Amino acid sequence: MTDNNLTIDRFLTPFVVAHQAGKPIVTVLRIDRLDRILRRCIEEQESRVQCVDCRAIYLIEKAFNPVNPFATSMSVDRLIYALGEFVHSPWLQDDVEMQAEQWRFVRAIVDTVERTPGFEERHMTPQLERQITMLRDHVRWGLHRTSQARGRR
């Protein structure tokens, strides 16, 4: 996670703005903890002691809450669909470097979910597979555009 140099508090604004505009996406709570949560997920996955139904995914889910503030977690598929809504909302910052970081942020979450032992066997459906493919295509496109924009500066 540190390779991507993610500064998580920078991502608070687009989520909050989208939520306040009434967009049907999740609000990210405790986002300052998200990079620690993702790092811990990766560490736990690498130790191979956690399955997808256990702590690794739960830690990601805890960072995201549906509009209902009393909900404590969401399912893996709901997390992926929420990310899909997020990338289709006007969430990108004007700054090219910031855009690249935001795309890497989305990619980091998808990577973390997919690398979790047991994810594919227990949770993958044709719809979810299409959603993940769409997210990966969006990330590829977004990073390509930011790379081109950097070259024009």
Regions found by a protein language model. Give the residues of each.
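Charge-rich, intrinsically disordered N-terminal extensions
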Residues: 1-92, 99-119, 135-153
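Short, highly charged C-terminal tails/helix-capping segments
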Residues: 126-134
